[in-house]
């Protein structure tokens, strides 16, 4: 019963993030705690932030899903359905990571900045906008994965190779 409630709570939280706009929500939260300075990814005293297995699993699944679609995306042959399916995979993994997060508070705060970029990219890919906007959404996902590699310790991480 507790697991079902936890799943429902995580799903509701993700839906709220998506409907309100994660970037605005995070920016507002950061603004209220730090005098209006924008939230920014930083290292943990010069070191990458620790990760847990759930985070590594979710980020690897996002990377793998994107890599599988890159030939079609770069060839301008990705259909709206392909973009939408990729966006769903990304949102599913973001929900999984949010539901199963075991990071300390500071690492979690940094992770939310990466998740914000992932959600923004997924939103652009699943929207009713042009293929150019969908392509730009995929670029946001690539950028988020690059930042993840810079700021988080994920042993064996292989980034996305963009042509």
What would you call each of these model-derived segments?
Residues 2-11:
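Bacterial N-terminal signal peptides that target proteins for export
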Residues 11-21:
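Bacterial N-terminal signal peptides
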Residues 26-78, 157-160:
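Immediate post-signal-peptide N-terminus of mature secreted/exported proteins
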Residues 48, 72-83, 104, 108, ...:
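Alpha-helical rod/repeat scaffolding segments in eukaryotic adaptors/tethers
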Residues 60, 64, 84, 88-95, ...:
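Solvent-exposed, polar/charged alpha-helical surfaces in well-ordered, non-transmembrane soluble domains
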Residues 93-112:
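Short, solvent-exposed, charged loop/turn and helix-capping segments
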Residues 100, 111-163:
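Helix-rich interaction surfaces within compact, conserved domain-sized segments
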């Amino acid at each position: 019963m507790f697991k079902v409630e936890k799943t429902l709570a995580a799903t509701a939280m993700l839906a709220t993030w998506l409907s309100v706009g994660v970037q605005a929500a995070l920016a507002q939260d950061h603004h209220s705690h730090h005098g209006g300075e924008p939230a920014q990814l930083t290292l943990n005293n010069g070191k990458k932030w620790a990760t847990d297995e759930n985070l590594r699993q979710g980020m690897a699944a996002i990377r793998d899903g994107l890599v599988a679609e890159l030939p079609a995306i770069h060839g301008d042959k990705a259909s709206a359905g392909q973009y939408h399916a990729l966006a769903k995979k990304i949102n599913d993994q973001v929900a999984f990571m949010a539901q199963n997060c075991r990071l300390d508070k500071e690492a979690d705060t940094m992770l939310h900045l990466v998740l914000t970029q992932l959600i923004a990219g997924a939103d652009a890919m699943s929207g009713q906008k042009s293929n150019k906007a969908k392509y730009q959404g995929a670029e946001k996902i690539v950028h988020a994965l690059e930042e993840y590699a810079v700021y988080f310790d994920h042993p064996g991480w292989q980034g996305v190779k963009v042509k």
